[in-house]
Amino acid sequence: MIKIYDTMTRSLRDFVPLTENTVNMYVCGPTVYNYIHIGNARSTVAFDTIRRYFEYRGYTVNYISNFTDVDDKIIKAANEVGISTKELSDKFITAFMEDTAQLGIKPATQNPRVINYMDEIIAFVSILIDKGFAYVSEGDVYFRVTKSNNYAKLANKTLEDLEIGASGRTDAETDRKEDPLDFALWKAAKEGEISWESPWGPGRPGWHIECSVMATEILGDTIDIHGGGADLEFPHHTNEIAQSEAKTGKTFANYWMHNGFVNVDNEKMSKSLGNFVTVHDMLKTVDGQVLRFFLATQQYRKPINFTEKAIHDAEVNLKYLKNTHSLPLTEEVSQAELQAYLDAFQAAMDDDFNTANGVTVLFDMAKWINSGNYDETVKDAFEKILQVFGIVFEEETLDEDIEKLIEERQAARANKDFATADRIRDELAAQGIKLLDTKEGVRWTRD
């Protein structure tokens, strides 16, 4: 059985879906005001890998990942370049889809955009007001945190902890709130900003309400898994829980999953620190599969340190797997030995999607394959495991002149003309083709 580390309970729990053999997942997507950086891509790759493993295990996955296209950062960025917020969002949504396609990310079941859910957001906020969980103040609408049952339980904080942190705050928005901890569900329009009509006057939604509405509209009041980066645990996911459960009276998500950060020199990669590298720029010099492999093969909850050496190691390891995949097939091999590798891989991945242990099994299997165990059944199993990591190798073919040289070398070896055989081998090596003579015949790989 798959076990998931649930942030809410701080424990490893058996995964039991609401509907048998179906997984409903909502993963917070990007705020589309710029290209995503490697840290953002970590979340995208981690949850794509988790989704792929569920599918490997036979589940149908409804995978929802949103685009936040209404936000302060988008408004600011659009104003700076003199275009509409929609034009800016459209540009970076397209860039996101193109960049993540190179990382082998499967298309989501749906990628909802906030701009398409405005009526539903207004209706959601209205219900919270009617139930006494929210109030209007000078055109803004705020959520009453003190009315929420066990607020901040996800972040393992108490109201007292938060109140200490909020003490002493003073600004115009705080003055409009009943309590400094209250958060905005709806923001009154400011001059020159995009806005929508509402019962409380023109304005736009707050960030937290957007995800609650899109998740529940598409997947229902309770979902199996809600995921995102560890930085979203508080306040974003905390506030999603508060407002969603206030509206429905039901548990919002049964499992909460959070991926670790990408660090540079052991410091979190972020735009605010200026130590980030965009995926868009990285893909100009690094193959998308290499970057994917670097991100996918670390246990998703642990931080990753981003270094040139780590990328180089991923490239070398991926090349070994590619060469293994291209080996010629052998005679039928031991199914018991194959099953042992499959069982070990499943045991690793069932343990909270431990890709670090899973990839160790993958390389053990590759070593076994290279020792002459590679029939159709093994190749199919090997490819399916690679696909969990988002890796698909195209079948490689050789040019006719290369094939002819290999045949000439085989003939020379048969005639014990080893000088000619060695000359052809060296000629092929100069072209990046490495030959390996085995009892099953000659194998080749590309350097």
Swiss-Prot record:
Enumerate the UniProt keywords alphabetically: Aminoacyl-tRNA synthetase, ATP-binding, Cytoplasm, Ligase, Metal-binding, Nucleotide-binding, Protein biosynthesis, Zinc
Substrates-to-products reaction catalysed: tRNA(Cys) + L-cysteine + ATP = L-cysteinyl-tRNA(Cys) + AMP + diphosphate
Work out whether the entry's keyword set contains Zinc: yes
What Pfam family is a match for this entry? DALR_2
**Which segments cross the bilayer?**
none
Protein name as it appears in the record: Cysteine--tRNA ligase
According to its UniProt record, the EC number is: 6.1.1.16
Domain of life here?
Bacteria
Source organism (scientific name): Streptococcus thermophilus (strain ATCC BAA-250 / LMG 18311)
Q: Which gene encodes it?
A: cysS
Q: Write out the GO biological process terms.
A: cysteinyl-tRNA aminoacylation
An example of a Gene Ontology cellular component annotation for this protein is:
cytosol
